[in-house]
Design a protein with these regions (language model features):
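Short loop/turn motifs at secondary-structure boundaries
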Residues: 40-42, 47-57, 119-227
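Bacterial Sec-dependent N-terminal signal peptides
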Residues: 1-25
């Protein structure tokens, strides 16, 4: 009786405990300087978009899993890229949808197991430039820049010329602009010329040429006249 009890006790204390590894694949990215994260999809994002994918494993115990992040474009059966890290970063610069699937292999004798898929959708491009601005210090429309509805512009270069064809300013940041000055001094009110060369994530090339009117005496409705 004692021997049987000893054997049962020994078995209870020597049987291995099953630990189930868990993963929580998550995409981390930034929109307008705000940190964002998603476990299922990123919808209608603007390019270029840098996303860090993390497997976020837990309860691994003695398990040392191998990771595969498979990047597949919508409509394709095969991934265009595979990454083999627990955490990987990718910059999306093309319009369309991409599925990012995390597969995990626990040992050399098992097939990769699909954990989950995160879908990233990049919008088509859009770029428009206004034909006037009023750099009068009222805090409204003081900077000449691309309209706020721009989307997925991955290359951008804008040039400002005066009436004699002389370049007086240029910028390459889609969120930048011109304050109506040249060499630190305000330019005269009147008509100037903008040339914009840009490229969208969908491959569309922009070659925008138009007049730009400086309206220094114009006060936007609702703006304060105080300095």
């Amino acid at each position: 009786m004692r021997i049987r009890a000893f054997i049962i006790t020994l078995l209870l204390f020597t049987l291995p405990t099953m630990v189930l590894a868990e993963f929580n694949p998550t995409a981390y990215y930034t929109v307008d300087d705000q940190a964002m994260e998603s476990t299922d999809f990123i919808n209608d994002a603007q390019a270029p978009l840098t996303v860090t994918f993390k497997a976020n494993p837990s309860n691994l115990g003695n398990t040392n899993p191998a990771y595969e992040w498979r990047f597949t474009k919508e409509g394709s059966q095969e991934p265009f890229m595979v990454r083999y890290e627990e955490e990987t970063t990718f910059e999306f610069v093309e319009s369309g949808s991409t599925s990012v699937a995390l597969y995990v292999t626990y040992d050399s004798n098992t097939e990769p197991e699909l954990i989950s898929t995160i879908k990233v959708s990049i919008s088509i491009s859009l770029l428009e430039m206004p034909n006037a601005f009023s750099p009068n210090g009222d805090g409204v429309n003081d900077i000449y820049k691309a309209k706020d509805n721009h989307k997925s512009i991955i290359e951008f270069h804008a040039y400002i010329f005066n009436r004699w064809g002389q370049k007086i300013y240029d910028w390459t940041d889609i969120n930048g602009g011109w304050d109506g000055t040249h060499n630190g001094k305000q330019v005269a009110a009147g008509v100037y010329y903008v040339l914009v060369k840009a490229k969208g994530s969908d491959g569309r090339k922009y070659n925008i040429r138009r007049d730009v009117n400086i309206l220094r005496d114009y006060i936007e409705e609702g703006a304060s006249n105080n300095p």
